Amino acid sequence: VALPEVYGYLLSRCGRRALAEDLTAETFLAAVEAVRRPDPPELTTAWLIGVARRKLVDHWRRAAREERGLHAIEGGLSPTDDPWDERLDALVAREVLEDLGPHHQAALTLRYLDGLPVPQVAELLGRTVHATEALLVRARAAFRQTYADHVKEGRDD
């Protein structure tokens, strides 16, 4: 049931059928591996889309790393190509997002990272627009609290 939604999600973001097919396969392979764990997650469409998004991000990271490597070999990297603070903030934000529950992760990812409007997020999550708006309010609050906890832990170390 979720296969067309996961594939459509990936295809709409990467624009390449072969890549979308590969990432869809990787997503469902990750789902099979997750089910084999002692405490498996609830396999919902939202959870699968979250996994698919991470697979796509991983693909883009690998491609960017390869491109940077080629650029470095050609001698084109400058010190300004390494915005450390931005990367650190992004890393903390990613860790915080991964600490949230699957519904909060999916809602925040679709709305803010993928830039989808609330009605489309609602459709993908199988919720009403009103229920999705309420979910986003709770998800943002959970993100803020978890982010504050991460920042506090970082200072305590």
PLM regions with names:
Residues 53, 57, 125-149:
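DNA-recognition helix of helix-turn-helix
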Residues 1-17, 32-34, 97, 149:
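Amphipathic, Lys/Arg- and hydrophobic-enriched alpha-helical face
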Residues 58, 66-95, 117:
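Internal acidic/polar
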Residues 15-17, 25-44, 62-64:
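Sigma70-family region 2
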Residues 6, 10, 20-31, 51, ...:
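Short, small-hydrophobic-rich alpha-helical interface motif
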Residues 36-40, 49-71, 86, 149-150:
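Arg/Lys-rich amphipathic alpha helix in sigma70-family domain 2
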Residues 10, 61, 100, 140-157:
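Short, Lys/Arg-enriched C-terminal cap helix and immediately downstream tail that follows
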Residues 98, 102-106, 114-134:
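Helix-turn-helix DNA-binding module
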